[in-house]
Amino acid sequence: MTSRHRALPVLALTAGLTSALLVAVPAQAVAPVLPVQCEVGTETVLAWDDVAYDLRGTCGVVRVSADHATVTMPAATRLVLEGAGNTVTAKPLLDVEVTGAGNGLTTPSVRSLVVSGAGTTVTVSGLVELAELSSTSSTLTADVVNVARLRGADAVTARKAYRTRITGSDNVVGLRRADKLVLTGDRNAVTVTRGRTTLRDGGDSNVLDLRPRRRR
């Protein structure tokens, strides 16, 4: 009896120590934050995977060849996303090219956007002057798009698009207003909820929902 009573506290103490050790070990390491100083006239290359980059200064060309990186950056003349699975938050950008897959970009405005990497997500709170999408399963969400060219199988959502040309197939486009719409691809779905749209449909099996202007 005596030896049994002495063993119980030892077992309880061992269980408590094991629990404490498990709590003390972190479940997952946090990605390091790496400050990067941009300089005018030089190309800034971000090549390390799984790193959080904090860019500062005046950026010219920024090239992201890393995978699964997080980038916070000021305005730049050109952004190239070659890696995969990156997340970029930027100030206004002039030219953007996305060739890697599964990247995400958030910015106030873009002058030229070219996307060929599959599964890209681009969110622009303001104006996109020119958007060319030739990928698959990519998404562009913007306030206003001046010229949109869809050559792959992607999706575009905007409040206003002035000129939209769809040469690819299986695209999904949702616009509040659209001035001109030209389709030569097949099986595209386009919805325009307000205003009048000049339409030319030379494709096959396209689903178009173009609602007339509301009378006052």
Task: List the model feature ranges, each with a label.
Residues 1-30:
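Secretory targeting and sorting signals
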